[in-house]
Amino acid sequence: MRCSISLVLGLLALEVALARNLQEHVFNSVQSMCSDDSFSEDTECINCQTNEECAQNDMCCPSSCGRSCKTPVNIEVQKAGRCPWNPIQMIAAGPCPKDNPCSIDSDCSGTMKCCKNGCIMSCMDPEPKSPTVISFQ
């Protein structure tokens, strides 16, 4: 019995620590990375050690001549949470507009996600993930 209580308390403490850690971080919906062609021979060798040494939005990336400033590649990162489920929003209330306000999460500000809303995509506040319930018997 003591072992079960200790296990439950340990899991609860871990869940609280992880939840706190997630709240402290702000995730960007677009992540910049060095491109795969960083090692190509035709790269200009402007040596650097950190991103701060590079002009504008360039990054200090590995290259054929050590490390040099390169234009990064932006990769879409999906924002936390999920789009809210509302069956009424899945049905268009009238004629559909031609343009969507968004097409990917990074088109939306803050923590909002790009979700289906009738016949268009629009920025909406996400639903938090449902907590996982663990039962011990």
Curated annotation (Swiss-Prot):
GO terms for biological process: antibacterial humoral response; innate immune response. Contains 8 disulfide bonds. Milk-specific; major protein component of milk whey. Gene3D superfamilies: Elafin-like (4.10.75.10). GO terms for molecular function: peptidase inhibitor activity; serine-type endopeptidase inhibitor activity. Residues 1-19 form the signal peptide. It comes from the Eukaryota. InterPro entries: Elafin-like_sf, WAP_dom, WAP_four-disulfide_core. This is Whey acidic protein. It comes from Rattus norvegicus. The lineage of its organism: Eukaryota, Metazoa, Chordata, Craniata, Vertebrata.
